Amino acid sequence: MRFSLSSADLQEWNGDVLAVGLPQGDVDATATALEQRFAGITDALKQQEFKGKPGDQLVITPLGGGPQRLVVLGLGESDAIDTERLRGAAARAAKAAIGCEGSLGLQLPCAGSDAQEAARICAEAVRLCLYKDQRFRKEPDPRRIPEALELIDLSPAAESGFAAVNATCAGVELARELVAAPPNVVTPAALADTAAGIAKDHGLELKVLERSDCEAKGMGAFLAVSQGSDLPPKFIHLIYRPEGEVKRRVALVGKGLTFDSGGYNLKVGAAQIDMMKFDMGGSAAVLGAMRSIAELKPAGVEVHMVVASCENMVNGSAVHPGDIVMAANGMTIEINNTDAEGRLTLADALLYACEQKPDAVVDLATLTGACVIALGDEMAGLWSNNDDLAEALDAAAQTGGEGLWRMPLRQSYKDGLKSLLADMKNTGPRPGGSITAALFLKEFVAKDTAWAHIDIAGPVWSDKGKGVNPAGATGYGVRTLVNWVLAQS
């Protein structure tokens, strides 16, 4: 999508759709100005009882020349217009422009944000909310959407805000496509192929470990999960190396269960087995982030992406409840629940990631229903052994408009993972389940390595769509990871 600034005012701008944001208290003055060009707009606003409140919206088709469509958006009180409200208004403008091609002109008051930030927020919102996945339809619906966004009445400094938008959004869209695709399409091999495509297109390094390679490295936890599937597991390591000196090295680890039946602890009832295609949402996020990072080429930061991908299925070879397996570090794990498989795959993935000697490791996983119960479907949970890393990720999430909330890593809860026979069990008691899951993962992180775990089970999917996310896969995590990596360059 093309982004630019327009120096034209509301009287002069000539594009296809003009969207104007009005705060409460400014409606009459702005309506009077619009009346000079769009006769009858004042009466239309009164008839609609448009007050400028958040959610107020009027769409009209002006007579005569000029824009095909005029969109007036309520923004609420001026002092309450923050970045989240700007993002929402830009998304509403884009949705109101569907059906028109050409350019969308957008004027929003950005007093509470600097011009560069406002430009980035609006551009990301417009592109992301216009996304629609029609890959699996025989006859895709014809769509007419704006091809360009022009921001009106912003200072020239705002231009730099567009720099990373298309690359970041392309990563989000890749993640959405991977999560949304059915499990007969996105398999472990397909994830490896996606990584290969990114490596080829952007000059990254790629290593894919096959089952025999994983056996040689002693990845018994990962391989135990995979043994019930006819599809071979793939352990994927994608590397971005910057030109020049490497000042920071980070690892992004994503859970890559392309389908999770639950194993012998089969998912039933409310477990929504039909939606378990999205159990690879963590791998989608890190692959999407790597696609964006590879295009943006941040200086000084080396990025390692690690995904242990397989299916969790049921057959005569599948792991049993009660089996004891050994991770690559020699730690033994009693599997008291085969449906807590993601942490087993992540155990060996985290150990491998730490072998790369990173300054920080961040893992993303659709790990627990407990996190969804605690935080709902708009927030991910964050656990970390390092305050600086947690704060940096929180800032990156806020910049990207992705909900993230730090959760306690309470050590006393680790007692719930004690096993009579093995070093630990893979699940603890139901209360505090997302915390014990994080404590389990922590056991596989090198002692002095900064680490964060982000449970994205809630926001990975949106049933109805909201804000910049259409219904379906959200691509959650890509913007947070990209912003975090860029902040270190």
From Swiss-Prot:
Source taxon at top rank: Bacteria
Co-factor(s): Mn(2+)
Top-rank EC class of the record's enzyme: hydrolase
One Pfam family cited in the UniProt record for this chain: Peptidase_M17_N
Binding residues annotated for Mn(2+) 2, in chain numbering: K255, D260, D279, E341
Residues that coordinate or bind Mn(2+) 1: D260, D339, E341
Residue positions of the active site: K267, R343
Gene Ontology biological process terms, A to Z: proteolysis
Main location, first listed in the record: cytoplasm
Catalytic activity: Release of an N-terminal amino acid, Xaa-|-Yaa-, in which Xaa is preferably Leu, but may be other amino acids including Pro although not Arg or Lys, and Yaa may be Pro. Amino acid amides and methyl esters are also readily hydrolyzed, but rates on arylamides are exceedingly low; Release of an N-terminal amino acid, preferentially leucine, but not glutamic or aspartic acids
Documented EC number(s): 3.4.11.1, 3.4.11.10
Key words of the record: Aminopeptidase, Cytoplasm, Hydrolase, Manganese, Metal-binding, Protease
Co-factor: note: Binds 2 manganese ions per subunit.
Recorded family membership: Belongs to the peptidase M17 family.
The protein, known as: Probable cytosol aminopeptidase
Annotated organism of origin: Synechococcus sp. (strain CC9605)
